[in-house]
Amino acid sequence: MAEDIKTKIKNYKTAPFDSRFPNQNQTRNCWQNYLDFHRCEKAMTAKGGDVSVCEWYRRVYKSLCPISWVSTWDDRRAEGTFPGKI
């Protein structure tokens, strides 16, 4: 059990500093990485490329964004009412 927790902590990677978002409030950073992930995923799927290159954006937004925001945005994307341009 303790080894499992140590492994999780060792492998945990949080969002690195992004100079586009120097302030303490990281809401915009969260939003931008969510959009970037889905744009990257859409572009790579259209080209028939490997979607795993987009994984960095997903890890960053998963680290920064509250789960409730992500689930709401996912629901809105599925419904076609998402306000962002993907």
From Swiss-Prot:
The modification N6-acetyllysine is found at residue 62. SUPFAM superfamilies: Cytochrome c oxidase subunit h. Pathway: Energy metabolism; oxidative phosphorylation. Component of the cytochrome c oxidase (complex IV, CIV), a multisubunit enzyme composed of 14 subunits. The complex is composed of a catalytic core of 3 subunits MT-CO1, MT-CO2 and MT-CO3, encoded in the mitochondrial DNA, and 11 supernumerary subunits COX4I, COX5A, COX5B, COX6A, COX6B, COX6C, COX7A, COX7B, COX7C, COX8 and NDUFA4, which are encoded in the nuclear genome. Keywords: Acetylation, Disulfide bond, Membrane, Mitochondrion, Mitochondrion inner membrane. Disulfide bonds join 30-65, 40-54. Residues 27-73 form the CHCH domain. This is Cytochrome c oxidase subunit 6B1. A motif (Cx9C motif) lies at residues 30-40. Belongs to the cytochrome c oxidase subunit 6B family. It comes from Carlito syrichta (Philippine tarsier). It is a peripheral membrane protein. Component of the cytochrome c oxidase, the last enzyme in the mitochondrial electron transport chain which drives oxidative phosphorylation. The respiratory chain contains 3 multisubunit complexes succinate dehydrogenase (complex II, CII), ubiquinol-cytochrome c oxidoreductase (cytochrome b-c1 complex, complex III, CIII) and cytochrome c oxidase (complex IV, CIV), that cooperate to transfer electrons derived from NADH and succinate to molecular oxygen, creating an electrochemical gradient over the inner membrane that drives transmembrane transport and the ATP synthase. A motif (Cx10C motif) lies at residues 54-65. InterPro entries: COX6B-like, CX6/COA6-like_sf, Cyt_c_oxidase_su6B. GO terms for cellular component: mitochondrial inner membrane; respiratory chain complex IV.
